[in-house]
Design a protein with these regions (language model features):
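Amphipathic alpha-helical hairpins
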Residues: 2-202
Length: 202
């Protein structure tokens, strides 16, 4: 009977093939989304917009003090007080977003919010103390602030998702929902407590 000779060349080739397909995992650490995007123009714009709204939220906290003091009805005073407390939470959330991005929490002067707040101060000066007309005007001023914030946070959420910053997007989304709720609440106060009585004033 013929003896079967083992083909050592085939074995060697097979072992080399197996070795080639079972490479060791790379020791290089995968980059985070932030590290990947930090030099992109969209990331830089996102960061600039965060600094902008960070400044704005601080300015709004101060403005709400004056608006609460100037308001006539307890309903509106309470709404301004509640929103001031809420805005402080928004500032804290923004600081968490900066931390997620591994960036220093910095403010950039926001001309838009400064203009809206200045308009609110002019309303206080130009309306009668204790009048419903003042409250109606203050609600409009406050809703201008809300609409600015809603537009800003809505845009920031979308950019965060585009850049893959999902945790940041979740935090910004929470604030966006709260801003929308505040806007609706101010409308309810105007409709239920203020506008009709303001219309009756001389």
């Amino acid at each position: 009977m013929a003896t079967k000779i083992l083909d050592t060349n085939s074995i060697t080739g097979a072992s080399e093939s197996i070795s080639a397909t079972t490479k060791k995992p790379s020791a290089t650490k995968a980059k985070t989304d932030t590290e990947t995007n930090e030099n992109s123009s969209l990331h830089q714009f996102f960061l600039s917009a965060l600094k902008d709204i960070y400044f704005a939220e601080d300015a709004i906290i101060e403005a709400l003090d004056k608006m609460q003091e100037a308001a006539t009805t307890e309903e509106l005073k309470d709404a301004f007080e509640d929103h001031q407390l809420q805005t402080k939470k928004h500032v804290s959330r923004l600081e968490k977003v900066f931390k997620i991005l591994e960036e220093k929490a910095e403010k950039k002067e926001c001309e838009a919010i400064k203009g809206i707040i200045k308009e609110g101060e002019e309303i206080i000066k130009s309306t009668e103390d204790g009048s419903m007309t003042r409250d109606a005007a203050l609600i409009i001023a406050a809703q201008k602030v809300e609409h600015y914030e809603i537009a800003t946070y809505g845009g920031l959420v979308q950019i965060a998702l585009t850049l893959g910053y999902d945790k940041a997007a979740d935090l910004l989304e929470q604030t966006l929902v709260e801003e929308e709720d505040t806007d609706e609440h101010l409308t309810e106060i105007a409709e239920n407590y203020i506008n009709f009585e303001a219309e009756q004033e001389d």
